[in-house]
């Protein structure tokens, strides 16, 4: 069973709130999950300590069992001070390298 550490959306319309969950890779985004390991509230200021709250010990456990974090969650995990496995870091680097640059707002408007 492939396991991912990802965001599950909650909250109201136009007021997002996310749970950081460990879930089966084939499960729906907001569906069943194995364990809740944190929260993310994008409505709070970026310097607020409660914007991202993670259970570091449980995340380390799931990473050791082979769970793969999504790109956004991997950034949160690194900022929290948890060391990601080398395999995950390599995958993130490859995805970042292959990503197309976004056009600026001016260029998009003109096109």
Swiss-Prot record:
GO terms for biological process: translation. PROSITE patterns: RIBOSOMAL_S16. InterPro entries: Ribosomal_bS16, Ribosomal_bS16_CS, Ribosomal_bS16_dom_sf. GO terms for molecular function: structural constituent of ribosome. One of its GO terms (cellular component) is small ribosomal subunit. Keywords: Ribonucleoprotein, Ribosomal protein. Coiled coil: none annotated. It comes from the Bacteria. HAMAP family: Ribosomal_bS16 (MF_00385). PANTHER family: 30S RIBOSOMAL PROTEIN S16, SMALL RIBOSOMAL SUBUNIT PROTEIN BS16M. NCBIfam families: S16. Belongs to the bacterial ribosomal protein bS16 family. This is Small ribosomal subunit protein bS16. It comes from Rickettsia canadensis (strain McKiel). The gene is rpsP.
